[in-house]
């Protein structure tokens, strides 16, 4: 006898019933439309960049990509999602705020989805599961919020953040902050800063992040025995600020360091280590040698 399906789409064994999901011809929520328009607009601005080229604007775009990407990896990912180190609130909050300008959502939404990803990695309930195809795990999942709720349920895995007023404030006002930022870009540098700066920088930041969800579960090498398809992709490590050592990350989720070997570039870890030396980052978590020996593929 088949297990009954619950309202969240799961049966009593916790598995989601598998069905072919249409990407375009489906019911779209307002959240889906807003996300899709944001992604489309950023790519459109990037396509306009050659017609509004200014070197200083393009240089700003590269800097914007680097800083917002680092804010995502440092704040949203390793600090908030995995609690791999602690920061004083006067530092934690501004870093989380700056990550908003990466256009990847507010902290509550980003952290919840990422925690679900680790809870249900490579299964039907993974929010951006690679088993549904490269393009789904790369980008399509972003614009299907009802499917995420259907698979994972509500945002009940971020109670630690929900208890803090600042993250509720960002969630309720994120649209204002993003529009304010892009308005300032235009007022400061006109179309060149919107296209070469925001457009080019935004597109690079988008796809570098998305490749961790897609490519790093398909191609690359494995150093650790994990129950998923995570891979280490060395050539992405510089661009992702160290996030592409993805097999390392899935083996030791709470580790503040993902480039576990000396030669594995991990810019996010270098910043965490600097903050630790300065006394700003505390309780920095790293895997023990015993943990490494248990999961190592080669000894």
Curated annotation (Swiss-Prot):
GO CC annotations on file = endoplasmic reticulum; endoplasmic reticulum membrane
Q: Which cofactor does it need?
A: Fe cation
Subcellular location(s) of the protein = Endoplasmic reticulum membrane
Q: Which GO terms describe its biological process?
A: unsaturated fatty acid biosynthetic process; wax biosynthetic process
**Residue positions of motif Histidine box-2:** 114-118
Main localization of the protein? endoplasmic reticulum
Lineage, top-rank taxon, reads Eukaryota
- One of the record's GO molecular function terms: acyl-CoA desaturase activity
Q: In which pathway does it act?
A: Lipid metabolism; polyunsaturated fatty acid biosynthesis
Entry EC no(s) = 1.14.19.-
Give one Pfam family.
FA_desaturase
TM region positions: 31-51, 55-75, 174-194, 199-219
Entry keyword annotation includes Glycosyltransferase: no
The enzyme class is oxidoreductase
Q: How does it sit in the membrane?
A: Multi-pass membrane protein
> Where is the motif Histidine box-1 annotated in this sequence?
77-82
InterPro entries named among the record's database cross-references: Acyl-CoA_DS (IPR015876), FA_desaturase_dom (IPR005804)
Similarity section: Belongs to the fatty acid desaturase type 1 family.
Q: What is known of its domains?
A: The histidine box domains may contain the active site and/or be involved in metal ion binding.
What name is this protein filed under? Delta-9 desaturase-like 5 protein
Q: Which species does the entry assign this protein to?
A: Arabidopsis thaliana (Mouse-ear cress)
């Amino acid at each position: 006898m088949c297990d009954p399906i619950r309202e969240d789409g799961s049966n009593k064994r916790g598995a989601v019933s598998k069905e072919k999901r249409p990407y375009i011809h489906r019911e779209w929520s307002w959240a889906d439309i807003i996300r899709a328009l944001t992604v489309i607009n950023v790519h459109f601005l990037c396509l306009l960049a050659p017609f509004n080229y200014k070197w200083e604007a393009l240089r700003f775009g590269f800097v914007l990509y680097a800083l917002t990407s680092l804010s995502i990896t440092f704040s949203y990912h390793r600090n908030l999602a995995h609690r791999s180190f602690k920061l004083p609130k006067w530092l934690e909050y501004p870093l989380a705020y700056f990550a908003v300008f990466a256009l990847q959502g507010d902290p509550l939404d980003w952290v919840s989805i990422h925690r679900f990803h680790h809870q249900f990695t490579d299964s039907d309930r993974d929010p951006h599961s690679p088993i549904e195809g490269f393009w789904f795990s790369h980008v399509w999942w972003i614009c299907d919020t009802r499917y995420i709720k259907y698979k994972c349920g509500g945002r009940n895995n971020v109670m630690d953040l929900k208890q803090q007023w600042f993250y509720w404030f960002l969630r309720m006002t994120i649209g204002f902050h993003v529009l304010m930022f892009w308005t300032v870009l235009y007022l400061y540098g006109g179309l060149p800063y919107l296209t070469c700066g925001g457009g080019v920088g935004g597109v690079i930041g988008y796809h570098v992040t998305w490749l961790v969800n897609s490519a790093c579960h398909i191609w690359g090498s494995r150093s650790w025995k994990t129950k998923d398809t995570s891979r280490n992709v060395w050539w992405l490590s510089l661009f992702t600020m160290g996030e592409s050592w993805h097999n390392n990350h899935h083996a030791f989720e709470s580790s503040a360091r993902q480039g576990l070997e000396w030669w594995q570039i991990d810019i996010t870890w270098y910043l965490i280590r600097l903050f630790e030396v300065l006394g700003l980052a505390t309780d920095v978590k790293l895997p023990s040698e015993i943990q490494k020996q248990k999961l190592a593929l080669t000894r």
